[in-house]
Amino acid sequence: MDVLKSEILRKRQLVEDRNLLVENKKYFKRSELAKKEEEAYFERCGYKIQPKDEDQKPLTSSNPVLELELAEEKLPMTLSRQEVIRRLRERGEPIRLFGETDYDAFQRLRKIEILTPEVNKGLRNDLKAALDKIDQQYLNELVGGQEPGEEDTQNDLKVHEENTTIEELEALGESLGKGDDHKDMDIITKFLKFLLGVWAKELNAREDYVKRSVQGKLNSATQKQTESYLRPLFRKLRKRNLPADIKESITDIIKFMLQREYVKANDAYLQMAIGNAPWPIGVTMVGIHARTGREKIFSKHVAHVLNDETQRKYIQGLKRLMTICQKHFPTDPSKCVEYNAL
C-alpha cells in the first residue's frame, strides 16, 4: 500500500514539475507530457531547441498555379502584342478576353505556358515550317544586302548534281528487277535524286519576282518538304535495309517511269500505297491447311501508306516526283496520267 501511495505522489509531483495543469483544469493530454519529457531530455543532453518561427515563409508548392498566385509582383511585359497573339493562337486560346488589357493577356499567356507546355509541337504543319524557312532566307537577304553585279543565288534551292542524263538512266533501267537488289537500290537512289535536281533547277530558273510571290514561295517550300520526306527512304536505300515488299513496289514504279509508262507507274503506286487484299473475316487457319482468303494476304498486296508516318511521307514524296517526271519527260497522251497536284 505504501508503494502505491509513493508512486501516486511521484507522478503527481512529475505533473506539477512539468506545469501541465493550468488553473481550473484537472486533466492534460498525453502528447503534452511527451513533449515536456522530450524537451527535458534535450536539455540534459545539451541540445538547444530552436523555437518555430510563426512568420516563416510557406514551403514552395508543387502546384504552379499557387506559385503564380503567390508571386504577385508586377513583371515587365517582355513580349510584343503581336508575339502574344501568335502564341495564343498556336495554343487555340482567345487572343483577348472581355475587359482584358494587353498586360493581362501577357500574364494569361505566361500562366498557360507554365501549366500546359507544348505537347503537340511534333504535329505541326511541316509545309508551314518550310514556308517560314523560305521567308527567313529572304529576310536575311534584305538585312545583309547584296553587292551590285552579284548574282542572286543565295536563296536558290539545293541541286543534287548526279552527273548523269535521262538517257543513261533509261539504259540503267533495263536492268531493274533482274535480281540484283543492291544495284536496284543504287539506280532508285540515283533516279530520285536526279528528279529532285531537275525540279530544283526549274524553280531556280524562275524570275526573282516569281520566287518572291506567294505561289513561288509555296512551290519552293513544296520542293524542300519533298526532299525532307525522301531522306528516310534514301537512308534505307543507302544502308540496304529497305523492306523487300516496298523495294519491289518502288522498283516497279521506277522501271515504268524510266520507260515513260506513267499509267502503269501510277497503278504500281496505288498497289503499294492502298493495296487490294481484303482481310478475310472469321477463322483463316483451320488444321494444317489455310483457307482461301488467307492465300491473298501477302505483304505485297497490303497497304503501306498507313503503316507509319515516315512511310506515308516518303510515299507522298515519291508521288510528287512521279508528277515532275511526267512534266519534264512527256510521252504519248495515252500513257500519261492527268495530274493537277503541282
Swiss-Prot record:
The keyword RNA-binding does not apply. Keywords: Acetylation, mRNA processing, mRNA splicing, Nucleus, Spliceosome. The modification N-acetylmethionine is found at residue 1. The keyword Secreted does not apply. One of its GO terms (cellular component) is U2-type post-spliceosomal complex. InterPro entries: Prp18 (IPR004098), PRP4-like (IPR014906), PRP4-like_sf (IPR036285), PRPF18 (IPR039979). It is found in: Nucleus speckle. GO terms for biological process: generation of catalytic spliceosome for second transesterification step. Its main location: nucleus. SUPFAM superfamilies: Functional domain of the splicing factor Prp18 (SSF47938), PRP4-like (SSF158230). Participates in the second step of pre-mRNA splicing. Heterodimer with PPIH. Interacts with PRPF4 and with the spliceosome. Part of a complex containing U4/U6 snRNPs. PANTHER family: PRE-MRNA SPLICING FACTOR-RELATED, PRE-MRNA-SPLICING FACTOR 18. Belongs to the PRP18 family. This is Pre-mRNA-splicing factor 18.
